[in-house]
C-alpha cells in the first residue's frame, strides 16, 4: 500500500489549524478575548486566503480616495519581509523615512505613492494605533486604514472589507498549510463588505458572485486595470513613464502571491512574454539572481518587466545597489477598476469619517 506522505502530514495540520482558529474566534465572539475600540475611525482591508488577492491595490485606491476628500489617512501594516521589529514610523505624512528592507515592499510602495499619508508598521496593530495617537496628538489623522487585518481581531473596526480573488477556487480550498485559506469561509459573516477582485466577467465571475451573495453581504466587483509602464535605464535614474506599447517582448519576473495574474495583465496589454521567472512572495533578490535575469534578457534581446512591488523591494536591498545602478528594467503600475459597486464602496467609506 502506498501513501501520499505530504497529504498525510498536511491534512491533519490543516485540521488542527482550523480548530485553533475556530476556538480563537469563538473566544472573541464570546468576549473572553477583548477587542479594543480606537478613538479614531478604523477601516480594515484583508482577505481570507494567503496572498495574491489584489488587496494592496485596493488599499492604495482607498488611501487615494480619502486624500481626494481632503482627509488625512494613516496606514497601519505588519510590514511583511522587513528586517526591523516593533513599531516603526515609515512616513510622517511629509517624508518617507524608510526603505523597503526596513518596512516591507508593499508598505514602501504605499508610502511613496501616497506621500501625504502617515504610514506605520508593527506586528501588533493596536501598538501602531496607540503610537499614532501619541505621536500625532496635535494633528490626528481622520481615519486609520489597517492593511491585511481581517484576522487581527484585537482592534474593532468601523468598516471591515474582505478581498477575494476570483481566480482562486477558494470555496473548494483547504486550510493552511494544505491549502491557502486562513480561516473557514463561514467567517466571512464578520465582514461588512466583500470585494471580488481580478474578475474576468465570464461564467466564473457569475458563479462566485452567486456563492458570495449567499453570505448576505454586499459584493463589489473589480478587475485589474493596467496603468503606465515605468522604465528606467539604471534603476536609480529618472523614470520614464509612458503608456504600454503592444509588441514589447519581455522577460517578466515577480515575487508575489499570484504571479499568473501579473502575466495575464501584461499579456492583456499586448506585451509578449517570451520568458518568465517567478519567486516566492516577498522573497529577497540577490545580485546573482538579478545578474542571471539581465544576462537572459540581453541574450534574447528582451525587456525586463516586473511589478511595482518587486521594484520597491529591490531598491531597498543594500546588497543590490551596485548592480541596480546599471540595470535597465520596467515595472507596470496597476489599479483596481470597479465594474459594479464603486458608488456603494464610496458611500461606506464616507460613512466611516462622517460618523
Swiss-Prot record:
GO MF, one annotated term: tetraacyldisaccharide 4'-kinase activity
Database matches in SUPFAM superfamilies: P-loop containing nucleoside triphosphate hydrolases (SSF52540)
One GO location term (cellular component): plasma membrane
Recorded catalytic activity of this chain's protein: a lipid A disaccharide + ATP = a lipid IVA + ADP + H(+)
Keyword Lipid metabolism set for record: yes
Signal peptide boundaries: none
Pathway(s) the chain acts in: Glycolipid biosynthesis; lipid IV(A) biosynthesis; lipid IV(A) from (3R)-3-hydroxytetradecanoyl-[acyl-carrier-protein] and UDP-N-acetyl-alpha-D-glucosamine: step 6/6
Top-level taxon of the source organism: Bacteria
Enzyme type, top EC level: transferase
Keyword set, alphabetical order: ATP-binding, Kinase, Lipid A biosynthesis, Lipid biosynthesis, Lipid metabolism, Nucleotide-binding, Transferase
Keyword match Transferase: yes
Binding site for ATP: 49-56
GO BP term, pick one: lipopolysaccharide core region biosynthetic process
The protein's Enzyme Commission number: 2.7.1.130
Pfam families: LpxK
NCBIfam families: lpxK
Family: Belongs to the LpxK family.
Xref: PANTHER family: TETRAACYLDISACCHARIDE 4'-KINASE, TETRAACYLDISACCHARIDE 4'-KINASE, MITOCHONDRIAL-RELATED
Main function: Transfers the gamma-phosphate of ATP to the 4'-position of a tetraacyldisaccharide 1-phosphate intermediate (termed DS-1-P) to form tetraacyldisaccharide 1,4'-bis-phosphate (lipid IVA).
Name of the protein in question: Tetraacyldisaccharide 4'-kinase
Source taxonomy: Bacteria, Pseudomonadati, Chlorobiota, Chlorobiia, Chlorobiales
Amino acid at each position: 500500500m502506498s501513501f501520499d506522505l505530504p497529504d498525510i502530514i498536511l491534512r491533519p495540520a490543516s485540521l488542527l489549524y482550523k480548530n485553533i482558529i475556530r476556538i480563537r474566534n469563538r473566544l472573541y465572539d464570546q468576549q473572553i478575548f477583548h477587542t479594543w475600540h480606537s478613538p479614531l475611525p478604523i477601516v480594515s482591508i484583508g482577505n481570507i486566503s494567503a496572498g495574491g488577492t489584489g488587496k494592496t491595490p485596493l488599499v492604495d485606491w482607498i488611501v487615494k480616495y480619502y486624500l481626494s476628500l481632503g482627509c488625512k489617512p494613516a496606514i497601519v501594516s505588519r510590514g511583511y519581509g522587513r528586517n526591523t521589529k516593533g513599531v516603526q514610523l515609515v512616513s510622517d505624512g511629509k517624508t518617507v523615512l524608510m526603505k523597503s528592507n526596513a518596512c516591507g515592499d508593499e508598505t514602501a510602495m504605499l508610502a511613496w505613492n501616497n506621500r501625504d499619508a502617515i504610514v506605520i508598521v508593527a506586528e501588533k496593530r493596536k501598538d501602531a494605533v496607540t503610537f499614532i495617537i501619541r505621536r500625532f496628538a496635535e494633528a490626528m489623522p481622520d481615519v486609520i486604514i489597517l492593511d491585511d487585518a481581517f484576522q487581527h481581531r484585537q482592534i474593532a473596526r468601523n468598516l471591515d472589507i474582505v478581498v477575494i480573488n476570483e481566480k482562486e477556487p477558494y470555496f473548494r480550498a483547504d486550510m493552511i498549510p494544505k491549502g491557502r485559506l486562513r480561516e473557514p469561509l463561514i467567517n466571512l459573516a464578520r465582514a461588512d463588505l466583500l470585494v471580488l477582485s481580478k474578475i474576468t466577467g465570464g461564467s466564473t465571475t457569475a458563479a462566485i458572485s452567486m456563492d458570495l451573495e449567499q453570505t448576505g453581504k454586499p459584493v463589489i466587483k473589480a478587475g485589474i486595470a493596467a496603468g503606465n509602464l515605468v522604465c528606467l535605464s539604471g534603476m536609480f535614474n529618472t523614470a520614464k513613464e509612458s503608456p504600454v506599447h503592444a509588441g514589447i517582448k519581455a522577460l517578466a519576473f515577480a515575487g508575489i502571491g499570484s504571479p499568473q495574474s501579473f502575466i495575464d495583465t501584461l499579456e492583456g496589454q499586448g506585451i509578449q512574454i517570451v520568458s518568465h521567472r517567478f519567486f516566492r512572495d516577498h522573497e529577497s533578490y540577490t545580485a546573482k539572481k538579478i545578474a542571471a535575469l539581465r544576462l537572459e534578457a540581453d541574450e534574447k534581446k528582451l525587456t525586463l518587466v516586473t511589478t511595482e512591488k518587486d521594484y520597491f523591494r529591490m531598491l531597498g536591498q543594500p546588497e543590490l545597489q551596485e548592480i541596480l545602478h546599471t540595470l535597465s528594467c520596467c515595472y507596470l503600475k496597476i489599479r483596481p477598476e470597479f465594474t459594479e459597486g464603486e458608488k456603494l464602496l464610496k458611500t461606506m467609506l464616507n460613512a466611516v469619517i462622517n460618523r
